[in-house]
């Protein structure tokens, strides 16, 4: 029998599908990536073609093995991590989607959300699903498809249609329609799942008129769900044995599996999650309560806060403001000045996320004087990412009563040393940047590997988690508080800027 030397992680993201091969020491052996089309049928609407998601993801899987010259019988298991909330409904018989995937960013269900608020559902939804009422989550998207595709609700009741988030869709395709499952982390983002009873919530299904028959079975994040045959050399059947939504996978990949450990992912936006162990902490500060993975992939809970504009504000400096040619230049220009000369940039281009949740806030630059130049504005834009992260962390500490000792970081913007140092300064906390930057794929690989005994336990993985650089606070508390107070003042003035129709 061929030795099982590798784990494959499939990382199905918002703009691309990736496959990553890892060895027993968690080294990345090979990566393959394919982008796919973003479909914008109307302003504020975002769709993907589910068949293209499948085509790009399945081809990266074949490609990544060919690239590394690995045969499929050397693969111990496959783990899947995915863009969360994105919603697909397909025919059980043919495997054909009845509509495009409605993406997490899509705002088309705002009206359904307004109805839920008017019907007084906010408290129920917060208490039982851990979420706020927002078009972001899957529940209202499923309702929209059933409302708009003729005859679909009746077909769903007859068991002819299936719903799934992207993980569920991929596993259905990989197992030729034999397995219809999701995991607790993805289920917790649907607004249809009771995070306390760990079952689909009958009241939510009733309110949104979604037949239970179309929902997947919900399982742990680390167990064998089914087998797939990916052909290639060997043509062996490989267990699919790990699933987690992208942010929860990153939390696990950073080994934040104990209560009070937190990570922040700096991508287009920032996603910060803090593990709260076995207790679901209800937020009084605008955060979400969500399910995360404990040390063996069992259910833990986490608080989550999302910042809408992180890397996106650096892209704005580059593409719209033309102040930099490349995102990497931002660090160089930011360090050409000692400070921002009193300038604050509030990048509320699409409103503000946690903990403010103000869709009517708009971007602003405050504190301009004649002495302000482009470098000050670049620096202030980078600093805004760190300030927004502190906003979320303060909310987490208030909700959980846990004081954070270190923040683990990942995502594209963590390569910026200026930003990471300022993040540590403004939090007054250590910031730890890992050697392996692919922590989302790493999380999926860990979950899959633990389920099949490729790794025995997390202790084995702890040794492999190398911190490449640690940033420590370099400013005094008074200075930190003074700067943060300026930020709070700026945010206050940017809020409620857009008129909203009463």
From Swiss-Prot:
* Alphabetized InterPro entries for the sequence: ATPase_NBD (IPR043129), Carb_kinase_FGGY (IPR000577), Carb_kinase_FGGY_CS (IPR018483), FGGY_C (IPR018485), FGGY_N (IPR018484), Glycerol_kin (IPR005999)
Task: Provide the binding site for glycerol.
Answer: 84-85, 136, 246-247
Pathway(s) annotated for this protein in UniProt: Polyol metabolism; glycerol degradation via glycerol kinase pathway; sn-glycerol 3-phosphate from glycerol: step 1/1
Chain residues that bind ATP = 14-16, 268, 311, 315, 412
Is Kinase one of the keywords UniProt gives this record?
yes
Q: What SUPFAM superfamilies has UniProt attached to this entry?
A: Actin-like ATPase domain
- EC code: 2.7.1.30
One Pfam family name from the record?
FGGY_N
* Catalysed reaction, written as an equation: glycerol + ATP = sn-glycerol 3-phosphate + ADP + H(+)
Report the leader peptide range: none
Q: Does the keyword Translocase apply?
A: no
CDD domains (UniProt xref): FGGY_EcGK_like
One GO cellular component term of this record is: cytosol
Which keywords does the record carry? Allosteric enzyme, ATP-binding, Glycerol metabolism, Kinase, Metal-binding, Nucleotide-binding, Transferase, Zinc
Q: Which GO terms describe its molecular function?
A: ATP binding; glycerol kinase activity; metal ion binding
Give residues annotated as binding sn-glycerol 3-phosphate.
Answer: 14, 84-85, 136, 246
In which residues is ADP bound? 14, 18, 268, 311, 412, 416
Single biological process term from Gene Ontology: glycerol catabolic process
Per UniProt, activity regulation is: Activity of this regulatory enzyme is affected by several metabolites. Allosterically and non-competitively inhibited by fructose 1,6-bisphosphate (FBP) and unphosphorylated phosphocarrier protein EIIA-Glc (III-Glc), an integral component of the bacterial phosphotransferase (PTS) system.
Q: What HAMAP family does its record include?
A: Glycerol_kin (MF_00186)
Give the UniProt family note.
Belongs to the FGGY kinase family.
Task: State how it assembles.
Answer: Homotetramer and homodimer (in equilibrium). Heterodimer with EIIA-Glc. Binds 1 zinc ion per glycerol kinase EIIA-Glc dimer. The zinc ion is important for dimerization.
Designated name of the protein: Glycerol kinase
